[in-house]
UniProtKB/Swiss-Prot annotation:
It comes from Cyrtonyx montezumae (Montezuma quail). It is found in: Mitochondrion inner membrane. The chain crosses the membrane at residues 34-54, 78-99, 114-134, 179-199, 227-247, 289-309, 321-341, 348-368. It comes from the Eukaryota. SUPFAM superfamilies: a domain/subunit of cytochrome bc1 complex (Ubiquinol-cytochrome c reductase), Transmembrane di-heme cytochromes. Keywords: Electron transport, Heme, Iron, Membrane, Metal-binding, Mitochondrion, Mitochondrion inner membrane, Respiratory chain, Transmembrane, Transmembrane helix, Transport, Ubiquinone. This is Cytochrome b. The gene is MT-CYB. Binds 2 heme b groups non-covalently. Heme b b566 binds at H98, H197. The keyword Zinc-finger does not apply. Heme 1 (or BL or b562) is low-potential and absorbs at about 562 nm, and heme 2 (or BH or b566) is high-potential and absorbs at about 566 nm. Heme b b562 binds at H84, H183. Signal peptide: none annotated. InterPro entries: Cyt_b/b6_C, Cyt_b/b6_C_sf, Cyt_b/b6_N, Cytb/b6-like_sf, Cytochrome_b, Cytochrome_b_C_euk/bac, Cytochrome_b_N_euk/bac, Di-haem_cyt_TM.
Length: 380
């Protein structure tokens, strides 16, 4: 009998073992769809980004008008731009839900997979930040100025660091050029780290909603989960296309319709919605270095989560107290996101400070305490 090329060819064999004959737990829910959705987001962003880059000029005098030209004169340029801008939002929605799933179901106990995932989040945030600067609108320029300025809070080398990042004494042409170079490079780095992420995942196999070994009950990935992933894909593409076609500027800032002007500052400088929670934490500390450290900690804290797991059970499926804390944390993040979009005045300042405090308290103190308490209550 002739060998099956899918199982014998050196390259096809890898694809087969990763996407077709992959043994998968039989009970993973829709919360496990987001990994494949993130892969689709990345592919979409790279393709639309490449098409945009073909018409973009990374120069302060031409950047804004080159984006306008893409939207007005390039065949379907408006659609490509709208898909790229809103695709970023969906990328973040998917990654936040993916991380939330990981926390709820204890997937972080696969430490290598989790740590590469957090690195992916950080790289994605860097990519989105440098990408937001490229249209060279008012919010692009001032967002870049405010966020890069945070590096000046680093003791002793801060100012040098900022001027090195800027390529001058302010955000100007060299900054835009290097941000474009970085924005082009980073998605490919993300793709590379994604392969490492998957390699680590396939060492252990997927977790499942019960958090117990599923070795006794595995099914092939294809056709079961490939079909389920296509359903998830349809459910994501529908709102993405709806947003991109009907209200493409809903999540953007109106300030970005004004070309960048270093002489006039917008009344409220704020990042895109997916960074607002971190921005609120940054602003809640009335000290530059303290704020920067809190901002960094708000994401880097994810690296600590595996070390803070004190429960004898892996998932939160049968742990109602931890579930309550989890959803309080989720609500807390929504509050931080809202506060990040508000001006710095009463009562938003105090709400932001309380929400920031409870964010760190929940993750660092309450989760381990409640995990230990549940062990005692269940006599584990």
């Amino acid at each position: 009998m002739a060998p099956n090329i899918r199982k014998s060819h050196p390259l096809m064999k890898i694809i087969n073992n990763s996407l077709i004959d992959l043994p998968t737990p039989s009970n993973i829910s829709a919360w496990w769809n987001f990994g494949s959705l993130l892969a689709v987001c990345l592919a979409t962003q790279i393709i639309t980004g490449l098409l945009l880059a073909a018409h973009y000029t990374a120069d302060t005098t031409l950047a804004f008008s080159s984006v306008a030209h893409t939207c007005r004169n390039v065949q379907y340029g408006w659609l490509i731009r709208n898909l790229h801008a809103n695709g970023a939002s969906f990328f973040f929605i998917c990654i936040y839900l993916h991380i939330g799933r990981g926390i709820y179901y204890g997937s972080y106990l696969y430490k290598e997979t989790w740590n590469t995932g957090v690195i992916l989040l950080l790289t994605l945030m860097a990519t989105a930040f440098v990408g937001y600067v490229l249209p060279w609108g008012q919010m692009s320029f001032w967002g870049a100025t405010v966020i890069t300025n945070l590096f000046s809070a680093v003791p002793y080398i801060g100012q040098t660091l900022v001027e090195w990042a800027w390529g001058g004494f302010s955000v100007d042409n060299p900054t835009l050029t290097r941000f474009f170079a970085l924005h082009f490079l980073l998605p490919f780095i993300i793709a590379g780290i994604t392969i490492i992420h998957l390699a680590f995942l396939h060492e252990s196999g997927s977790n499942n909603p019960l958090g117990i070994s599923s070795n006794s009950d595995k099914i092939p990935f294809h056709p079961y989960y490939s079909l389920k992933d296509i359903l998830g894909l349809a459910l994501m593409i529908t709102p993405l296309l709806t947003l991109a076609l009907f209200s493409p500027n809903l999540l953007g800032d109106p300030e970005n319709f004004t070309p960048a002007n270093p002489l006039t500052t917008p009344p409220h400088i704020k990042p895109e919605w997916y960074f607002l929670f971190a921005y609120a934490i940054l602003r809640s500390i009335p000290n530059k270095l303290g704020g920067v450290l809190a901002l960094a900690a708000s994401v880097f804290i994810l690296f600590l989560i595996p070390l803070l797991h004190k429960s004898k059970q892996r998932t939160m499926t049968f742990r109602p107290l931890s579930q309550l804390l989890f959803w309080l944390l989720a609500a807390n993040l929504f509050i931080l996101t809202w506060i990040g979009s508000q001006p710095v005045e009463h009562p938003f300042i105090i709400i932001g400070q309380l929400a920031s405090l409870s964010y760190f308290t929940t993750l660092l103190i309450l989760f381990p305490i409640v995990g230990t308490l549940e062990n005692k209550m269940l006599k584990l």
